[in-house]
Amino acid sequence: MLALWLFQRFGLDVATTGMIFFVTGLCSAASYFVAVPLARRCGLVNTMVFTHLPANFFLVLTAFAPNLWLAFVLLIMRSLLSQMDVPTRSSYVMAVVEPEERPAAASLTAVPRSLASAIAPLLSGWLLSASAFGWPLVLAGLLKIAYDLMLLQQFRMVKPPEES
């Protein structure tokens, strides 16, 4: 849906869209390597939340970008931060649950993401058909910010053994 919004908002051609997603994908991949030392220094939950919050703020700001270059910069900044929660979340879940509960816990943490991925295109398509403004980006960013704040509130005191 992001590609559709970029096309609607800026008239972006397919080749430029591919280049944007290539660059943001590389940035996301690189961020995995930064997540590990950051988590060692700041803790797993803090790394998840305090990298995801600004990433989601950048997503919201992207909807308000007046031109493609600013949108591109915001998307790059987002991609540098938005995936650092993936390895840290996996590590955290595996550390705080009993070994026999780990497969169920891993599944349980994946289901909400899968459901959101299934519902998001339907809602985004409806929003984009009603307005060319980036409402899907704003809504997604705000929902993710709420998720991050709830995660911090619920789990900031639940330390994995290596952080105790």
Residue ranges and their predicted role:
Residues 46-61, 141:
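Structural signature of the two symmetry-related core transmembrane helices
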Residues 63-75:
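Helix-loop junctions at membrane interfaces in 12-TM secondary transporters
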